[in-house]
């Protein structure tokens, strides 16, 4: 009798274990289907010109222009971390040319950055559209300031190859422009939550500074700043009052 009860208890335990496994499997299957459905859902992105760009899925590889502007590259590296070199299909050399100290630190952590194909720059007409098409990225991020020349010289070729263009803007030096650029890049790469965290971090700190400065009731001194990328041998390299930090 005791052996029979023990055997029945054993069967009950096995039965419960099987049921638990089936429930877990069904739940896992349901969750997988949910994630798959989300990944297959078209992604609508509003870029900095107000255009709506639709991606079938998050971009896996992209081309970057004006990397030396700092903003887009820093946003991408904050979004992707050590995977940054894997997602950049090609870029210009302005980051390493104009911000050599930053480039040195980034390549020390991610040596693969130095192996990313150089595709030239739209701004100085070295942009190699044929090379970009051959690299087959999903997206190309273009600064708003390059829009006219890009649309004249290269965009038709990108459109024909099915490469989506997303305009961003880190040069207006406006909080809203930075926020929208971070959001657009994050959405394009399927990193919306992380992009929201980055945007909040940035917004909190900029707002904190602006709030403090707005409360200073003293004469504001005149300040002259230069762009240091040409070294101490050159002077007069600065921005006008209607561009970047010259605002």
Model regions: which residues?
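Short, aromatic- and cysteine-enriched interfacial helices/patches
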Residues: 1-2, 27
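Bacterial N-terminal signal peptides that target proteins for export
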Residues: 2-13
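Core hydrophobic alpha-helical transmembrane segments of single-pass membrane proteins
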Residues: 13-20
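C-terminal motif of bacterial Sec signal peptides marking the signal peptidase cleavage site
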Residues: 21-25
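N-terminal ligand-binding lobe of clamshell/alpha-beta domains
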Residues: 26-247
């Amino acid at each position: 009798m005791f052996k029979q009860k023990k055997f029945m208890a054993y069967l009950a335990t096995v039965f419960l274990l099987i049921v638990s496994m089936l429930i877990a499997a069904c739940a896992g299957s349901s969750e997988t289907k949910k994630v798959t459905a989300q990944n297959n859902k078209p992604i609508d992105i509003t870029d900095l010109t107000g255009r709506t760009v639709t991606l079938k899925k998050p971009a896996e590889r992209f081309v970057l222009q004006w990397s030396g502007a700092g903003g887009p590259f820093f946003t991408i590296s904050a979004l992707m971390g050590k995977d940054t070199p894997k997602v950049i299909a090609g870029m210009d050399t302005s980051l390493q040319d104009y911000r050599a100290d930053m480039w040195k630190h980034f390549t020390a952590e991610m040596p693969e950055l130095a192996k990313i194909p150089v595709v030239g720059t739209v701004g100085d007409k070295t942009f190699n559209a044929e090379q970009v098409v051959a690299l087959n990225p999903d997206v190309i991020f273009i600064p708003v300031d390059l829009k006219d020349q890009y649309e004249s010289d290269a965009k038709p070729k990108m459109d024909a190859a099915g490469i989506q263009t997303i305009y961003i803007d880190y040069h207006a030096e406006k909080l809203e422009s930075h926020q929208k650029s971070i959001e657009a890049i994050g959405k394009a790469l399927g990193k919306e939550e992380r992009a929201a965290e980055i945007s909040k971090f940035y917004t909190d700190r900029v707002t904190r500074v602006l709030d403090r400065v707005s409360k200073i009731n003293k004469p504001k001194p005149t300040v002259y700043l230069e762009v240091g990328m040409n070294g101490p041998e050159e002077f007069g390299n600065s921005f006008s009052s209607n561009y970047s930090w010259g605002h």
